[in-house]
Amino acid sequence: DVYKRQNIESGEGYCDILLEVPENRVGVVIEMKYAQEDRMEAACTEALKQIEQRQYAARLKSDGMKNIVNYGIACYRKHCKVKIGKENS
């Protein structure tokens, strides 16, 4: 089973999406940004920084997740860009 939470309080703010796969002890943090086409790369980087700075993985860690992956996603119209970061745990 996968557990999903949206706009949930975690760390020092509210992250867009948290996913937990308890049997594998895997957690996923997703932060999304809307950006102009020429700023999509930067928006992905900003999303990953926000995940770290606001400690959005804190709730996943307290729930026992050991492997945490962060996704910074930027959207512009029908296009999106994704950057992946691994949480140091």
Language model: regions and residue ranges:
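An acidic- and aromatic-residue-enriched active-site/binding cleft used to recognize and process polar
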Residues: E9, P22, K33-A35, I73-C75
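Conserved catalytic cores of phosphodiester-cleaving nucleases, focusing on short active-site segments
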Residues: I17-L19, V26-Q36, R54
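Nucleic acid-processing catalytic cores of prokaryotic defense/repair systems
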Residues: S10, E46-Q53, A74, K83, ...
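Short, small-residue-biased leader/transition segments that mark boundaries at the very start
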Residues: V2-Y3
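Switch/connector loops and helix/strand junctions flanking conserved nucleotide-binding motifs
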Residues: G27, D38-A42, K78-I84
